[in-house]
Amino acid sequence: VVAAESDTDMRAFYEGQIAEGHDGVGERYGEALADLGHGGATDAVAVLYDLHQRHQGSPMIAAALGQAQMSAGATDAALATFTDALRLSPRNVPLTIRYAEALMRVGRAREAHVMLLDLFNNVAPTPEQIRLTALAASAAGDTGDAYFYMSEYHIANGNLPLSVQQLELALAAPNLTEVQRQRFQARMDEVREAISRDRKRKPEPGGEQKASR
């Protein structure tokens, strides 16, 4: 959600825009993100709260407000903002991600894990979102699932050998259910088969020269 450049202070730009009368939603939102990106969480909350009151159907503004409230130390207000916004925009990806991050920060990783699973059973995750799910599972003590998600992260990044390593760790995790064990093993078999197919497609070094002799 926070799109302000971390290396560039955009506050002066937005202050100038607003001073010139360009004070629409975009300018005010940009001003808040610039404040948040440079340590002005309290100022960002004030601006975003006003925008949120006027545009309660915007998950983008709600997500930014919740994040700003977390940064300002207003944890209860942030969690309430996220909860209310998700009722209006269930499974909104940026909003759910920010809410999950907030839950992890306050020690509610298991809720974050469940929330992310629900989201990504309906929306295909990016590699970084898979990694976040792994972090949530690990923080919740769901070790086997955490390794499994990291295997999926490596698959998404094209590193199948690392995926196999993570699946081996997943299968060695304690307290697995039979369903988990079967799921992890099935995925392991799929990945190993993919590695085997890939190796067969690649010619051996010097293979072409040998064939031409």
Functional labels for PLM-detected ranges:
Residues 59, 63-144, 148:
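Alpha-helical adaptor scaffolds
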Residues 138-143, 155-162, 176:
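Short amphipathic alpha-helical interaction segments
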Residues 1-84, 115, 159-161, 165-169, ...:
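Extracytoplasmic and endomembrane cell-envelope/extracellular-matrix remodeling and assembly machinery
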Residues 20, 54, 88, 122-123, ...:
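Structural marker of alpha-solenoid helical repeat scaffolds
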